[in-house]
A protein has these predicted regions:
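Phosphate/pyrophosphate-recognition segments in soluble nucleotide-handling domains
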Residues: 111-159
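Generic beta-strand structural signal
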Residues: 11-12, 86, 106-107, 139-141
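Active-site-proximal alpha-helix that buttresses catalytic centers in soluble enzyme cores
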Residues: 138-192
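Unchanged
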Residues: 41-132
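Conserved Nudix-box catalytic region and its N-terminal flanking loop in Nudix hydrolases
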Residues: 21-64, 153-171
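A generic fold-level signal
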Residues: 6-8, 20, 80-83, 103, ...
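N-terminal strand-loop-strand
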Residues: 2-38, 141-147, 151
Length: 192
């Protein structure tokens, strides 16, 4: 298989939990790079950054995650290719499979903020932790426009809300479920 030469797209999370009212940060050891990093990974083809951030966090840490506010996007070069990593603040959600050491991640530690920043191999990751800790606690509020539906001119029904989705619209609606779940959305309000 030919090696890709285009931009690298990735997503990650500053994963937090509390212990006695103090925040702890999840840091990971990657044996191949011999470094300490935050949960992150490359997007699968056609994958949304939000879905990738959650998927990579679960895969690498064994913790399910609820995403919060977006953080700064890191941009740097890897083997002369531009890489961008989109980050979110994340908190643990009960029900993850639990951490199992593997060839990609062989150690996971939950550390106080200062110790986590000191442990990380890259200063830019420490900057993300400082940014994450500085964010207010929020509840996501997501505003969406409907996905692609049949043209109004072609629809003969009495109520526009019954206008069927196109094939693309149906695929978008299915993918939207995972996006909303990543933010732990529990209520949906709709207009006519």
């Amino acid at each position: 298989m030919a090696k890709s030469t285009g931009p690298i797209r990735a997503a990650g999370v500053v994963l937090l939990r509390e212990d006695s009212g103090q925040p702890l940060v999840c840091v990971l050891h990657r044996p191949r790079q011999n470094d300490w990093s935050l949960p992150k990974g490359k997007l699968d083809p056609g994958e949304n950054e939000i879905i990738a951030a959650r998927r990579e966090t679960i895969e690498e840490t064994g913790s399910d995650v609820v995403l919060g506010v977006p953080l700064a996007t890191q941009r740097y070069k890897v083997e002369n290719r531009p890489k961008s990593v989109h980050y979110w603040v994340g908190t643990e959600r009960p029900g993850g499979p639990g951490f199992t050491p593997n060839k990609e991640i062989d150690e996971l530690r939950w550390l106080p903020v200062a110790a986590a920043i000191d442990m990380l191999s890259y200063p830019r990751d420490g900057d993300l932790i400082r940014e994450a800790i500085g964010q207010p606690t929020t509840t996501p509020f997501i505003i969406l426009r409907h996905t692609e539906a049949m043209r109004r001119a072609d629809f003969r029904g009495p109520v526009d809300a019954e206008r069927p989705l196109t094939a693309d619209g149906a695929q978008h609606a299915v993918r939207l479920v995972d996006v909303l779940d990543a933010f732990d959305i529990r209520k949906v309000y709709s207009s006519d």
